Design a protein with these regions (language model features):
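Juxtamembrane regions of bacterial inner-membrane/periplasmic proteins
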Residues: 2-217
Length: 217
């Protein structure tokens, strides 16, 4: 009984420390871009050479890029509060049927929470922390800031983070110089930017579908 009590207290203490740290950092990130994210650290530990992100202000990110990422990743981004219970339920049912975690059902806010603070493995513990973290992000940040941080810190190539660095890596020029076709290719590959590039996305059926969805949007 004493062991169980100590375990509960330890767990509560760890959660309090984690969410407290997330709250403080999120308040800072409301005004300052994070110099490093959890995903960057994980990639470094995997031996990937991480390149510095090149953050862009929200107003300088092409309008099509912002609208397209919401269209592809999170249709209800502007109306939900960080977590979509329906999507989580569907993902849970699919995972139970498969016998393993295959789908995440994550919103853009949850993906940002994972990239900033958590680890990339598909685990129910991480999903629970991700949901709680997303609620903090939605409480302390505006939707514009969440989308800005997301686009500036997701991976767009091996160790390449942010839409500006991703554009330079994939096309050799800044994102504001890209046309709609190039932006569609760039955003189509974010499901697996380590294995695929804008030149090889046709080798992946899902990425090809995402690309043509944007081109016909």
């Amino acid at each position: 009984m004493k062991f169980l009590k100590n375990l509960v207290l330890l767990t509560l203490g760890a959660l309090t420390l984690y969410f407290g740290t997330v709250t403080v950092l999120t308040m800072i990130y409301a005004h300052i871009d994070p110099p490093v994210t959890a995903l960057m650290v994980w990639r470094s530990l995997e031996g990937v050479k991480v390149k510095p992100a090149v953050p862009l202000a929200y107003a300088k990110i092409p309008s099509f890029a912002k609208k397209a990422i919401v269209y592809l990743e999170d249709h209800d981004f502007w109306s939900h509060h960080g977590v979509e219970l329906g999507a989580i339920r569907e993902a849970w049912q699919a995972n139970e049927k498969a016998g393993r975690v295959e789908r995440g059902g994550s919103t853009i806010t949850q993906q940002l929470a994972r990239n900033l603070f958590l680890w990339p493995d598909r685990m129910y513990l991480r999903k629970a922390l991700e949901a709680g973290t997303a609620l903090i992000l939605e409480t302390l940040l505006t939707k514009d800031r969440i989308l800005e941080l997301y686009l500036n810190h997701i991976e767009w190539g091996p160790g390449v983070f942010g839409i500006e660095a991703g554009s330079r890596y994939q096309f050799g020029t800044g994102v504001r110089n890209l046309d709609v076709e190039q932006l569609s290719r760039l955003e189509a590959i974010i499901t697996n930017p380590v294995k695929y590039s804008v030149k090889t996305l046709e080798h992946n059926r899902g990425m090809t579908a995402r690309y043509y969805a944007l081109m016909g949007w």
